[in-house]
Curated annotation (Swiss-Prot):
One of its GO terms (molecular function) is ATP binding. GO terms for cellular component: cytosol. The gene is cysS. This is Cysteine--tRNA ligase. It catalyses: tRNA(Cys) + L-cysteine + ATP = L-cysteinyl-tRNA(Cys) + AMP + diphosphate. The keyword Aminoacyl-tRNA synthetase applies. Belongs to the class-I aminoacyl-tRNA synthetase family. It comes from Chlorobium luteolum (strain DSM 273 / BCRC 81028 / 2530). SMART domains: DALR_2.
Amino acid sequence: MPLVIFNSLGREKQLFEPLHPGVVGIYVCGPTVYGHAHLGHAKSYVSFDVVVRWLRESGYRVKYVQNITDVGHLSDDADEGEDKIARQARLEKTDPMEIAQFYTRSFLDDMDRLGVLRPNISPLATGHIPEQIALVDKLVKRGHAYEVNGNVYFSVESFPGYGKLSGRTDLDAVQSGARVGVRSEKHNPSDFALWKKAEEGHLMQWDSPWGMGYPGWHLECSAMSMKYLGDTIDIHGGGMENRFPHHECEIAQSEAANEKPYVRYWMHNNMVTVNGTKMGKSLKNAVNLKEIFKTVDPLAVRFFILQSHYRSPLDYSDTAVAGSTAGLQKLRETRQRLIEATPGTGLLDAAPFSLRFREAMDDDFNTPVAIAALFDFSKALNTALDRPDGLNASSLEAARELFSTAAVTVLGIMTEDAEGGMHDGGRSAETLDEVMGVLMELRSEARKNKDFATSDLIRDHLLAAGIEIKDTREGASWSKTRH
């Protein structure tokens, strides 16, 4: 089936047709780097990572841009309050750029561990001040913006389409409660800041035609997306909490400046809850990824996220993550068994499972249904491999190709060079086998001598290192529990 995407702008699934055949430009709002990444970040960036992976697997040439907000995001997410990075720098008694660079590195490290592919371009807001000033100047000259006391505001009344994404069309009702700051100097309470005058001592400020200041949060994404992807973007993604005001303001300022549609397909991922309660830093229940990774395989966290559709809420609990960890381990064991299998004479048609997987992904990137198809294939594969005649060479090849495409290339829940991969690291894998052979023999001798303390010690230390031992009537076996 052709790819369909739920477009938040039209509030319906729509056939995907990029602006230029065979080429897709996608922009996703990146993090504001003033703290470590949490599970909400993981939900968003894993979801859009799979979108990019599937588009590439489908034959599109994808240019993926994801910004880093290192200035201009105020503490109330609108026009008031202190810059979040400047505030963190003040709290930590250091420079804002040091804060931004430290937490950018932290964010990228977490994304790498989750298997999130790096975007083609990761522009910094501070590296695009001239582009942002030029966009503000263009809006002022076109009559869509005005300056008051060194602040420049976008005039919402000048853009009739304001509210078309969020459905908020009653401008009188769009007050500060909707997170667009109200200032008496604005012509309309709904007007939003494009450029903010820097207060005395402000740590990050630049010269502009309106005096020393810094860009508004909404402005950054418009300027950077248009620079790298053009005036019209195929896909713009982000969390549903950004739909208003952030994305609504992006549309207004971009379309007012260029008189062209800004985005063809708007995609919004849903939010994360913790044990049924909304997650947030203000509620002090934000789940820090680095804390999760101390006890949970990062790829199991990724698998947990993908078991829920990107537009569905994700409820985090220890029980749910444990279930995902166990499920991923079953798939890894099946794949390892598939790698080690030698050709027999039996048959297994992988095509129906491959079709189910592709149809699920073409249906608005439905990863839960795609994963269900992979589990069904895993079950059928194990049944076939249990038979005395096994599987013939062509069936094994087709099965390996399906597992590689689904689990590695598209879902990203396994890697090529780790356990469960099509390649196992060459000499490093041989070395591991040799070491494990010695340890398994030592443990076997300990059990024969009823030295269960030593036997259990070996087992427990290996488990802590990511290797699980299973004792059965046929003997002991081992497998990796993480990459």
